[in-house]
From Swiss-Prot:
It comes from Trypanosoma brucei brucei (strain 927/4 GUTat10.1). PANTHER family: ATAXIN 2-RELATED, ATAXIN-2 HOMOLOG. Keywords: Cytoplasm, Translation regulation. Involved in post-transcriptional regulation of gene expression. Promotes mRNA stabilization by bridging poly(A)-binding protein to mRNAs. Residues 201-296, 441-550 are annotated as: Disordered. The gene is PBP1. Coiled coil: none annotated. Residues 244-262 have a biased composition (Low complexity). Forms a complex composed of at least MKT1, PBP1, XAC1 and LSM12. Forms a complex composed of at least MKT1L, PBP1, XAC1 and LSM12. Within the complex, interacts with MKT1 (via C-terminus); the interaction is direct. Interacts (via C-terminus) with ZC3H11; the interaction is direct. This is PAB1-binding protein 1.
Amino acid sequence: MEGSHSSNMERLEYLYLNLVGQVVQVRLVDDMCVEGLFVACTDVDAETDAGIMICCTRNLASAKRSPLSPSCVNFTDDLFIPYQSIVMIEVQNAKIRTETPGRPDTGRADFSATKFDWADDGVSELLESEPHQTGTWNQFEANEKSFGVKTTYKEEFYTTRLDHSKITEEQRAQADRLAREIESSSTRGIAHRMEREECLHDDEGLDEGQLYSDVHRPQEKKPPYVPPSTGGRKLVNEPPPVPAAAAPATAPTTAPAAAPAPAAAPPAAAPAAAAPPPPPAATSMADDGSMRHKRMNEDPHHMQYDANQTAAGFNPAAAPYTPMKPGAAVPVVDFLASLADAISNNDMCYDCEPHWPGMCNLFYDQDDSSYSQQNYEAAAMPPSHSMNMHMYVNSQPNIPNAHRGYQGPLGRVPHNQSMPMHHMQGQGFHHEMHHHQAFHGMGNYSSQHHNPPIQEYAPHKGQQGVVSRPGMRQGKGGGASRVEPQQPVSANTASSPPPVPTVDSAPNEVKPPAKLQRGRGMAAFTKGDMDGDSGATTNATGGPKKRVGK
């Protein structure tokens, strides 16, 4: 009875404990499936509320629930499900073990551990504890005695075969003496001392790398390094210096050779002639001293031509080399001064024309077209057209000062220069003169047909309009369909002023509405013919024409 109770109830309770916190799917008797987190359970024998408790529940898709229903998408609160409504509880990835990991009874509990001795007890002793006898044990004899294997080893295969009968007693005694010296001598390193079992006292302050890893080599005492210089240390094979007393002894031998020098010689040559040449031995020693900083096995290589030759007494701390000006002895100090001097002394330098204007900033442009030349002539002409055109040779009246300065010595611009365009003539000079008239630029004006500038005004009603000049665009008909640009007005003050506009005294209630009429030139307002009289008013401000009438 007790065994059956523990066999069922305890296993079920253990299963419920492993399901706590796991995601479970509970299938109910009404063919619904609910998913949630397992929280708790009650006893099966409880009188009331016997079941399980799950939280964060939602309904899964089934025959009664569609996948898009709110109960399948949204999570609800805790849900209590009684045992009588549960068909099956399904859980995935649940770890259920009846044994605790690491317990000794989880494996083969039926067999006991058996001790196995691989060797005798005496094998555990150290090799150093056994007594050693040098020279008495032979491996070949031991193998032959124990295993019956006879060796084929011969010493002659690995070394030179010696004939002991030819070795004398003196050689044997010498070999024994050297062997005793080697064996009794001190070791050369730490490794030898450790091989000979010479224990080190507290490792003698050496680290592990120095004891076992480093390679120890004998330290040779080398002289300290001396940097190369002219006054460096003395070489081993350097010849001894010449005594100081030898120099005056050689001076009288060369003095008579310099005595017959002429008196007219320059002062700078006297010290050079008086200085005796050094002896060959001293020259070679000086060369050795100057080349002392170079390598001993390097031969000096001299170039055929050196642009920067270094003197014998070269001083690195001296002022840098300054290039000399060709043909002079003064160094080039000021680059701008030398450049200006070179330009002024150059005969092939470009020479501009002497009459080029210095006030070219007064002109907007330099136009050499026929329009600019013709307009310039028209602007330079006086108001009276009866004067002779050839009288203006050296000076021209009514010319701006800027153009006066631009004229050549003969009154006109040179033939290889273009006529400038003045800013006062920039609006109407392209439309007032005939195209491509003859122009003479050698000092005089040629006979040309000039049309005087005409002031345009709006024609009065009943009068004929102004005759169009050459070069003007003709209208399309009596009534133009578009507004043409207003022609520029010449600055000629000799033309008659425009008439004064009349005052319209008609009452406002009698005036018909004004109509817009488009035309060319000046615009005017025209009043309708009410009483048989015709009148016209001119608008000085310009604009489209307006006609008033029925």
